[in-house]
Amino acid sequence: MSAGIGGHTSSDMRERFVSDVISKNGKVVSIMAGINDIAQNDGYISNADILNNIASMAEMAQRGGSKVILCSVLPANTIGWNPAIRPADLVIDLNSRIKAYAESHDCVYLDYWTRLVDENTKGLPAALTTDGVHVTDECYEIMEEMFLSTLKPLLK
């Protein structure tokens, strides 16, 4: 099941995490958050605070007995709805924080960024995005394959 809501930030996700995710008693919980924070959908928030929100959700899931997959933020070099933001370096920094947290807190890190990045632009390749942030069906297919190969061993 998916509990994602378009436009929500990590703070929004954290607020509804117990009712929307923990209450479902999933064996595995996947968390993908950060781009709407970087886009300042709710105003400025530091990468440290974004990570704190992600960590809070991961800890709630683990306390509930779920295994946790922490997904990287996808590559982005533009935010169409907030063009003043230059997200590429912020995404790279947040992903390094998420990865370090995952490695030190018994979570699995799913690195979409490395597989999907256009090294020249530090964003998504044009063929995989509709606007620099949101992905095409082709990109979803790549992500689905990566997600399922990460998920399957955790279900054993």
Language model features with spans:
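A short beta-strand-loop structural module common to alpha/beta enzyme folds
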Residues: 1-9
